[in-house]
Regions:
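Intrinsically disordered, low-complexity coil segments
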Residues: 42, 131-138, 187-193, 219
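Structural alpha/beta surface segment adjacent to cysteine/selenocysteine redox centers
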Residues: 79, 85-170, 208
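Short clusters of hydrophobic/aromatic residues that line enzyme substrate/ligand-binding pockets
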Residues: 62-64, 154, 226
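Alpha-helix initiation and N-capping motif
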Residues: 23-26, 141, 162, 177, ...
Length: 245
């Protein structure tokens, strides 16, 4: 997959979607200020109804890390994407240890289902799981997210069917598969429209596949983009560059 390290100003990047954001509009406080850490990982998750200075609407997206982290990392992924699974297994743990736990980076998880209808099914379920846990047990999103990637099979082989994903969900503690199923039935179409908007916005940033990443510094209003299952040292370099280290 293509790799891009270009460093661009926030205004130039957001201008690509025809939007000019005043610097005073940069918002990083979570609307739900209480963060919860998973007992096994110690990773804080939170939600927000705000938009960032880069133009990302945080509503509906799980956020891992401190609300006041120095940098945002927007991560577009597809549960069927083998490169995303490689990133999750080989690179993400290093990013979490070196940059999330230390308060430097917070990660915003954004769905980019592009491989098939099954990818959209998984993306909608992701939104429904987050909707269920975000207010009282936001950290429970992480075991579900990890379980789905652990169960990944060949793309479009049927492993990401709704019944199979619900079976995976039943195996995750404190995630109610019945409520998730009801959410998909009641809200599925609307959620698909929201995800479609996210995909269009990602495309305007030059994201054409998954995984795709934008690192954004709200202080300098600069951003760096990475595409593909890059090794952790590529992220280390991008983070250092944005922080002028």
């Amino acid at each position: 997959m293509d790799r891009l390290d270009s460093l661009v100003t926030r205004r130039a990047a957001v201008g690509a979607i025809g939007t000019v954001l005043a610097s005073s509009g940069v918002v990083y406080g979570a609307s739900r200020l209480d963060t919860e850490s998973d007992e096994s990982t110690g990773l804080p998750f939170h939600g927000s109804s705000e938009s960032t200075g880069f133009g990302i609407d945080l509503d509906g997206h799980p956020i891992m890390g401190a609300p006041d982290a120095a940098l945002d990392m927007y991560y577009w992924g597809d549960y069927q994407c083998p490169f995303c699974r490689r990133f999750e297994q080989n690179t993400l743990p290093e990013i979490i240890e070196k940059h999330v736990r230390t308060g430097t980076v917070r990660i915003v998880f954004i769905e980019y289902p592009y491989l098939s209808d099954a990818s959209m099914t998984a993306a909608v379920m992701d939104r429904c799981v987050w909707r269920q846990v975000r207010d009282e047990r936001p950290s429970r999103y992480w075991p579900w997210h990890s379980a789905v990637f652990d169960a990944q099979g060949e793309k479009n082989s049927g492993w990401a069917s709704r019944p199979n994903l619900l079976e995976i969900t039943r195996g995750v503690q404190d995630v109610d598969a019945t409520a998730v199923d009801a959410c998909m039935r009641k809200r599925g179409y609307g959620i698909e429209q929201e995800i479609g908007t996210d995909v269009e916005q990602a495309s305007s940033f030059g994201i054409r596949g998954s995984p795709g990443f934008v690192l954004y510094d709200p202080t300098t209003q600069e951003a760096g983009k990475l595409v593909g299952a890059q090794p952790h040292d590529r992220f280390d370099a991008a983070i250092s560059k944005l922080r002028n280290e």
